[in-house]
Amino acid sequence: MQSSEVKPFSRLRAYLCPIYKSEFSKFVPLFLLAFFVGFNYCLLKNMKDTLVIVGSDAGAEVIPFLKVWGIVPGAVIVTMVYGWLGSRYPRDTVFYCFMAAFLGFFFLFAVIIYPVGDSLHLNSLADKLQELLPQGLRGFIVMVRYWSYSIYYVMSELWSSVVLSMLFWGLANQITTITEAGRFYALINTGLNLSSICAGEISYWMGKQTFVAYSFACDSWHSVMLNLTMLITCSGLIMIWLYRRIHHLTIDTSIPPSRRVLAEEGAATANLKEKKKPKAKARNLFLHLIQSRYLLGLAIIVLSYNLVIHLFEVVWKDQVSQIYSSHVEFNGYMSRITTLIGVVSVLAAVLLTGQCIRKWGWTVGALVTPLVMLVSGLLFFGTIFAAKRDISIFGGVLGMTPLALAAWTGGMQNVLSRGTKFTFFDQTKEMAFIPLSPEDKNHGKAAIDGVVSRIGKSGGSLIYQGLLVIFSSVAASLNVIALVLLIIMVVWIAVVAYIGKEYYSRAADAVATLKQPKEPSSSIVREAQESVEQEEMAVL
């Protein structure tokens, strides 16, 4: 839907809300849909961590095993189901099917599965595995023992990849034009960050106050879980209504319903035929990545972030679990961290990111994330090593024990890392694709966003599994983890410096090519230059 309004925005309007009046009927439900998707994601993220870390015997050591042996197979199965449904049904039916599956499972877990969890858990099998396997595989044994918690963790994690990445962004990319996307997406990302603030505060408040008292609740944590699950269910129903509204707004009403169904079935069949080709092209994707130093550097940057954030988070959550031993307290703490991540992300996006990149360039913007993670990581591990030796650094001044100070420093490290990732890291990564040719963009994004990021997440878990087998616990392997993190971040910073030089060189070449006098019309040159500038500004 193109806007018929051509009047330019005022400077303030262009900065705060660059949306035409005729576009509000599409933008507002899309913005609200993004908000509720993010809202549910944040609530689920905190609850899944609380369940598996506090509710199990292994603490944070179970997370690396869940990410490899739970999430990876789950993602493969869901992708296959998504492809099967997408090849046979229209996009709205696929959305409703997945929403019904997710909401139905979360409701069923909170109301039925969790109260009878003790009788469902595989205690006898886990006891036998405990006799056979080394102590370092305790996380794997716990994953098997508390299988219902593990499935909840996997389903909550898949909410992000399925509902947010596949369904929501798939819809957004399908119904928005390129010019609309440049103006819509920045505000939609702000909506996602705002949902983090709201979800964090509501989750924290529900841990302190009883919203609705349930007579069948097993304990205080079950009561909190029931209230949060009802919120998730209501939010999901609102999402279904918003999706239906967007779907009806964007379909072409001039086409008769019978022909519209045939057209959607034809598109689904075409998608199925196209999905048979990628296996032949997968090798070309990686060859393309390896043959280009620029794309290989971007892949290393994305891989480094995913490795570093996962290695940091397991250590931090292990420290937090030693302080907050109850479900309600742990969930409340994680909820406050979620709120702070949203606040930092919004403030950084509005006040820092665009201005910093415009003033000091791509390299400085891309260095912000690794430098912030390096400095905060050094402080975090410094407080951990001090706590192990019972040395009080600032604890006496702040009124904290060494362990509490280590957990607090880790929380701030996570807030700053996530905040800079959602702003500086994501935007500079997207900007790095702009000077590339269309072929490099398509192949590079497919390989980096689709495969490399997943390898990074799984790679961090595999590193932990190896260390746990050798050292038996996270605490015993801290020295090695710190060294691995330091090496990764140094490599990350060096690669950013190299890519920065290449980025400016490629950008200058692209502009020089556009300015060549061989072009038949100067207006074409101007339009091409403006399109490049608009693409770069859309990212900022």
UniProtKB/Swiss-Prot annotation:
Cellular component terms per the entry's GO annotation: plasma membrane
Pfam families according to UniProt: TLC
MF terms (GO), sorted A to Z: ATP binding; ATP:ADP antiporter activity
Keywords: ATP-binding, Cell membrane, Membrane, Nucleotide-binding, Transmembrane, Transmembrane helix, Transport
Main subcellular localisation: membrane
InterPro entries: ADP_ATP_car_bac_type, MFS_trans_sf
Regions crossing the membrane: 24-44, 62-82, 94-114, 151-171, 223-243, 295-315, 337-357, 367-387, 391-411, 458-478, 480-500
Localization per record: Cell membrane
Superkingdom of this protein's organism: Bacteria
Bilayer topology: Multi-pass membrane protein
Protein family according to the UniProt entry: Belongs to the ADP/ATP translocase tlc family.
NCBIfam families: AAA
Protein name per the record: ADP,ATP carrier protein 2
Species annotation: Chlamydia pneumoniae
